[in-house]
Curated annotation (Swiss-Prot):
PROSITE patterns: ENOLASE
Name of this protein: Enolase
UniProt key word Disulfide bond: no
Pfam families the UniProt entry points to: Enolase_C, Enolase_N
Name of encoding gene: eno
Positions bound to Mg(2+): 246, 291, 318
Names of required cofactors: Mg(2+)
Family to which the UniProt record says this protein belongs: Belongs to the enolase family.
Keyword vocabulary terms for this entry: Cytoplasm, Glycolysis, Lyase, Magnesium, Metal-binding, Secreted
Residues holding (2R)-2-phosphoglycerate: 167, 343, 372-373, 394
Length: 443
């Protein structure tokens, strides 16, 4: 019953209106697993390669028919008659078939879609939810926890076309007692922020990840608006809600001057100066998490940032580590950052994703499961966060169904687990105890 009889690839549309890859894995007996691959817009240079057609006669060159063809021919032929329950073997077959270090032959978008579709098919064979199947192949059967969300409510950077440099301004509902309550808190603050922006005559248009994208006087102005929305929602800054940011600093790093240019500040910063800029923000606002605070290759700058803030707040590597064991191990060896963003399409298979999560946990790095700016209705990352007890999830705002689908999946999982739905909330944030005791009372 676990034997693969057919693998199908197709081109579908993602949340930005661009093509992406969807795959189906068909098993003997009629079981079908279906999954799709997301796509980023601010892409780390070390990410696994996403194969695009680059044929300008269709979809502005963004088509994925080459990746789909790889699924329908090479991948399908190599997986026929294989056992879907052996996820590691399935993924290794595709990795070997690709034959490159960054999956540039078949494409990480093709391999990941099939990898996830296979896991879904395997879970159906066992008649268990995907998160339970993931916990089993992760060798942590029966161990689950609900993630604390990072809820994106203001978009900047490459996720929209406003004048804000920092890519994501997020809230974390640390006062919540369940994922359902955390989502409620995020929704209320999101809608109150929209009302405040409207009252001030600011744009309430939304960016790629569902957050508002107004033009602001400065990056700091975003925090002021969010604080106002939190208070209007009758929550307390520091006690109920803390902040998180994704700088995506590689996007405003200028190679020619080797400096960081913030257009909203109209100023250039050296690595050291930008570290001090971030440090000051954490002193002025309850920021418990900073992602990609420096350029992906600015290891020296990241080392400085870690020295200043690494024992106080959560420092997350996204472009820095790209869900890659090699770069995570290097960061661990050098004592850089203390957390990692987990994006399955950065590495290109479920097996490799689980490997990176294990390494991070072994060395005390927090893990945050993440979406991409180009998403679909696929909710696999919700199951991944629960099945690996990763502790935190980053899946956008309280608008756009490609984002809310993941939140809704988490609500259903929590309901299904009942009294076994463990939600650690605030405790999942790296170094939150140290920071909370010394700083949050000031806000």
């Amino acid at each position: 019953m676990s034997k693969i009889i057919k693998v199908i690839g197709r081109e579908i549309i993602d949340s930005r209106g661009y093509p992406t890859v969807e795959a189906e894995v068909h098993l003997l007996g009629g079981i079908i697993g279906r999954a799709s691959s997301p796509s980023g817009i601010s892409i780390g240079s070390r990410e696994a390669h996403e194969v695009r057609d680059r044929d300008n006669s269709r979809f502005l060159g963004e088509g994925v028919t080459k990746a789909v063809k790889s699924i329908n021919n090479k991948i399908s032929k190599s997986l026929i008659s294989k056992n879907a329950q052996k996820q590691k073997d399935i993924d290794q077959i595709m990795i070997n078939l690709d034959g490159t270090k960054n999956k540039s032959n078949l494409g990480a978008n093709a391999i990941l879609a099939v990898s996830l579709a296979n896991a879904k098919a395997a879970s159906k064979i066992k008649n268990i939810p995907l998160y339970k199947h993931i916990s089993e192949i992760n060798n942590t059967p029966g161990i689950f926890s609900m993630p604390l969300p990072m809820i994106n409510i203001i978009n900047g950077g490459k996720h929209t076309n406003n004048n804000i440099d920092i890519q994501e301004f997020m809230i974390q509902p640390i006062g919540a007692k369940s994922i359902k309550q955390a989502i409620q808190m995020g929704s209320e603050i999101f809608h109150n922020l929209g009302k405040i922006l409207n009252e001030k005559g600011m744009s309430t248009s939304i960016g790629d990840e569902g957050g508002y994208s107004p033009n602001l006087k400065s990056n700091s102005n975003a925090f002021v608006l969010i604080k106002e929305a939190v208070k209007r929602s009758k929550y307390h800054i520091g006690r109920d809600i803390t902040f998180a940011i994704d700088c995506a600093a590689s996007e405003f790093f200028e190679e020619s001057t080797q400096s960081y240019y913030l257009k909203s500040e109209n100023n250039f910063f050296s690595s050291y100066e930008f570290v001090l800029f971030l440090k000051k923000l954490t002193e002025e606002y309850p920021i418990l998490s900073i992602e990609d605070g420096l350029h992906e290759n600015d290891w020296e700058g990241f080392s400085m940032l870690t020295n200043y803030l690494g024992n106080k707040i959560q420092l997350v590597g996204d472009d820095l580590f790209t869900t890659n064991p090699k770069f995570l191990k290097y960061g661990i060896k050098k004592g850089i950052a203390n957390s990692i963003l987990i994006k399955p399409n950065q590495i290109g298979s479920l097996t490799e994703t689980l490997e990176v999560i294990k390494i991070a946990k072994k060395y005390g790095y927090a893990t945050i499961i993440s979406h991409r700016s180009g998403e679909t209705e696929d909710v696999t990352i919700a199951d991944l966060s629960v099945g690996t007890s990763s502790g935190q999830i980053k899946t956008g705002s309280m608008s756009r169904s490609d984002r809310t689908a993941k939140y809704n999946r988490l609500i259903r999982i929590e309901e299904e687990l009942g009294s076994n739905a463990i939600f650690h909330g605030k405790m999942e944030i790296k170094n939150q105890f140290i920071y909370s005791n010394n700083n949050l009372k000031n806000f």
